[in-house]
Amino acid sequence: MTSKILITGGAGYIGSHTAVELMNAGHQVVIVDNLCNSSIQVLDRIEALAGKNFSFVQADVRDGAALDQIFAQHPIEGVIHFAGLKAVGESVAQPVRYFDNNLGSTLTLLQAMDRAGVRRIVFSSSATVYGDPETVPITESSQLQVTNPYGRTKLMCEDILRDLQASDPRWHVAILRYFNPVGAHISGTIGEHPNGIPNNLMPFITQVAVGKREFLSIFGNDYPTPDGTGVRDYIHVVDLSLGHLAA
């Protein structure tokens, strides 16, 4: 069964890959993005990869009137909500900006969805809500111990969604917590290309590989690992996109 899905932040790293996978699965897609951390060129690449047209609206998800217009013009059946700011360090320096953007966009979106009678949403949360876990691997029941404003905005959005669904069983909500997505579409035409200074490790590595940076500094030599440097787990962005499709 095909549906028309609204993707907020759909021009971004995970959103663009998810848009391709949705269209490959036969769904129709509408993307809303303010392009604050993505490029307009990504839209043409999404269309070329999927071999299908989709609708794009350049708008901030905090703009309720813009969302109302989208829902009025398209028979949206569900929403995947990626839009938001995501840099941990930046959130510590600019907490109010993060609360305004991440909470404001979620609240405005939910209100617009309710007005339109669209009550299916997949929310892009983060494993940041677990803070520094005492045991690994992390499970859904692991203790939540947020350590930064970014993670706190994600957890607060989760709480909003839980309270909303508890108050109105017509809502269908899926919350996905993940971290460290890497990789790119097999074509290489879309991947992680953030505007400005990257917030993740892999873009720095690729910039060194292609000569945009001379070197990459590795910090820390006393971790409990064979060589003392840090170790991280990663998830491929296409696998993550397929997870959103399944949700």
What are these model-derived regions, one by one?
Residues 1-184:
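N-terminal Rossmann-like NAD(P)+-binding domain of SDR-like oxidoreductases, especially those catalyzing
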Residues 162-245:
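NAD(P)-dependent short-chain dehydrogenase/reductase
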